[in-house]
Amino acid sequence: MTRESVNHCMNDPWWLISKGMSESLNEELKKELSQQHILYGKEAIAVARREDNDDVIFWIEKMNKYAVVHLTYTKETTSEYPITSLYSQRELEEYCKSVSKRY
């Protein structure tokens, strides 16, 4: 899956990110995850983010899912943070559209 897979559902407040920003957000996620977190040890590729908060959409190939992660910019010690929701592509499209309608 690539950024192009979700491009058609990226309306405000969502926006696709550059490769450089993706790499930076991928590293930030790694810093934040505790060993108990559902994404720990899995390759995550940032594809989009919200302009009004710290939510980032990551593609998790090993799970064949997208993860919407609310980054905290802090090293976390529990499985609860950063808050993460997993979606299939169809579910992610619905979620992003619902956020855009409320935005």
List where the protein language model places each region.
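Generic secondary-structure transition motif, activating predominantly at the C-termini of alpha-helices
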Residues: L29, L33, H37, A48, ...
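Negatively charged, low-complexity tracts enriched in Asp/Glu with abundant Ser/Thr
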Residues: T2-K42
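Amphipathic protein-protein interaction modules
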Residues: I38-I83
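Aromatic-enriched hydrophobic runs in primary sequence
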Residues: W14, L33, K62-Y73, V99-Y103
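Generic ordered-secondary-structure signal
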Residues: N11-W14, S18-M21, D52, E93, ...
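Arginine residue identity/basic-tract feature
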Residues: R3, R49-R50, R90, R102
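A short, surface-exposed interaction/processing loop segment used at functional sites
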Residues: H70-Y103
